Amino acid sequence: MNHRTWMSLLSLGAFVAQGAAWAQTAGAMQQKVTGPQARYWLGAETASGMAMPGMGGGGTAETGGGLGAMAGMMGALMSGGGVGAPRKSLRLELGGVRTGNPSEARHTVPTALAMGESLSLLGPEKGTPAAERPERDVPEPPDGKAKGRMLFFWGCGERAGPGQPVVLDFEKLSQGVLPPDMRSNINLRAFRQGPAMGRDAGYADWPNRKNSKTVPSQASLVGDHLVQGNFVPDIRFAVGGAHDFMEALSLKQAKATSGAQQLQWNRVPTALGHFATAMGFKQGAGDSADIVFWNASSTKLLGGEQLMGYLPPAETERLVKARVLLSADTTQCAIPAEAVAAAGGGMTWINLNAFGPELNVVHPPRPEDPKVTWEQQYAVKMRLRSYTGMLGDMENLSAQRSNKADEPASRTEEKKEPSPTDQVKNALKGLFGR
């Protein structure tokens, strides 16, 4: 064996040995993680305008879907602020690896929250079944009788982009025919779910069947927090100004000469991105109707109701770069004239969501030595958003209602069952809103 061959073998041996050493080091660097024993999720929302309680957010079936936000709306009315006045809401969800039978906890809050010394979390009554969360999918018209269409538009601008609208015909749908262009051009990621009854051995939340308070308009989350319960270790965390309630959105609209519907809103300092949606109706001939959906994504996205809740900051950043979400600095957008015309001259309902930061606390902190097991006692996640809603072109909506009211009385009386048009609307329940 010559010298060159020996050198090649030595080099190969050194490479293999180095690779084995790297693999051994990588294996040694893999830190073992256990827990957490408890997870605590907080949802802090600021609503304004005609935003619906629990719209795409933290409301759950266990509490009637947005009990805190509803209390906030009622509080605004009672204080004379009106439905459009900014209102805050909280949703607290605590899960543990053991149960308290029943599970109970107390969240000692900062004085700045102005809600007393503490909030009482309560688990479900014994024997209460876990709430089912129905999947949202393209609805099937009842008995194939529904007549009408769903029209999908997307993107800001006075004119609709190419390939719009995507049309879903209910009569064709009843025959099993879907349009070939129903697929969106962006995948929205699924994220780890928070604490919930049936998902955690022990579970308690607030507001609940016994405890519910209106969150005052001046409430602040800033300060030290302590959570103590009969099924979890003590949980301590602090909230700074960067993770306080977000400022309220103020949404305005105007009709452009092109026929587009101009939207404009204020800049919320802690917002990381925005998403807007709109919906409209247009009565067709006979019992048919068109339901029009629009969203602000520059990338083809049908519907988009799933973006009217919370998002992790990393996902917000990804979707801003993908031009699905509007940037934090964007404060205006136009609903294309074609979408407005398809809705009979004006959108009926408009929603705007501002995604905020997220506070994550894990105790104890990760050990610097990777050989030491990271035994997590608890993990806290606080999510923030600000959202608003408004009625669109009221004159157009009133005109359509007036035309419907002008139908002959005899024809109206003949219809003892819901009309096919109403069946289309009923089939939409749970698709792009609650």
Language-model features, listed with the residues they occupy:
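Structural beta-strand segments of beta-rich domains
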Residues: G259-L263
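Proline/serine/threonine-rich low-complexity linkers at boundaries of modular beta-sandwich domains
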Residues: P233-F245
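Solvent-exposed N-terminal domain segments of exported/luminal and surface proteins
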Residues: Q30-N208
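Sec/Tat signal peptide C-region and signal peptidase I cleavage site
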Residues: G19-A23
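Bacterial N-terminal signal peptides that target proteins for export
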Residues: M1-L9
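Bacterial N-terminal signal peptides
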Residues: S8-Q18
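Hydrophilic extracytoplasmic domains
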Residues: Q264, T270-R434
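Short, aromatic- and glycine-rich surface loops/edge beta-strands on solvent-exposed regions
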Residues: N211-I235, G345-L359
